[in-house]
């Protein structure tokens, strides 16, 4: 007997459509204003660090695609109880990373690239495990691309250095607001 699920087909179509439209207009459906400001600042950091507009756009586009797809999966109730526990663990680890990034930004001479990179790598692994059975290998590669980019110790060291102070301050302001509002 043929196994057919209209829900599965609709979800597949939704993910396919969203993957083709990962621009700002679609992102605003899933990403609030503060998150959007943080993403814009992360784009600026990536662009200045890599000296490449296209590389910076690619990493942010990948980040948005992954965030939207995970949001669609979550809102559609696609995660099993075990996967929901992984999602909770991911959120806690991401929150820990945000608080660590804030602490490093607020207290002089406390920054350690290895600590922040380690937290981001843990987030990557948890997220990959969470979406293992739901997203394509191409989406898994996007996750690796985003987390590998932002967990690069050289990029993190530059971000916490004097040349990126303005960007770091804006990122920290956004992270603080997201934490205060319980969105992170």
Curated annotation (Swiss-Prot):
Acts as a negative regulator of innate and adaptive immunity by maintaining immune homeostasis. Plays a regulatory role in the Toll-like signaling pathway by determining the strength of LPS-induced signaling and gene expression. Inhibits TCR-mediated T-cell activation and negatively regulate T-cell function to prevent hyperresponsiveness. Also inhibits autolysosome formation via negatively modulating MTOR activation by interacting with RAC1 and promoting the disassociation of the RAC1-MTOR complex. Phosphorylated by TAK1/MAP3K7; this phosphorylation triggers association with BTRC and subsequent ubiquitination and degradation. Ubiquitinated in a BTRC-depdent manner; leading to degradation mediated through the proteasome pathway. Its main location: cytoplasm. Keywords: Cytoplasm, Immunity, Innate immunity, Lysosome, Nucleus, Phosphoprotein, Ubl conjugation. Belongs to the TNFAIP8 family. TNFAIP8L2 subfamily. The modification Phosphoserine is found at residue 3. It comes from Rattus norvegicus (Rat). This is Tumor necrosis factor alpha-induced protein 8-like protein 2. One of its GO terms (biological process) is T cell activation. It is found in: Cytoplasm; Nucleus; Lysosome. One of its GO terms (cellular component) is lysosome. May interact with CASP8; however, such result is unclear since could not reproduce the interaction with CASP8. Interacts with RAC1. It holds the Pfam family DUF758. The lineage of its organism: Eukaryota, Metazoa, Chordata, Craniata, Vertebrata. The central region was initially thought to constitute a DED (death effector) domain. However, 3D-structure data reveal a previously uncharacterized fold that is different from the predicted fold of a DED (death effector) domain. It consists of a large, hydrophobic central cavity that is poised for cofactor binding. It comes from the Eukaryota.
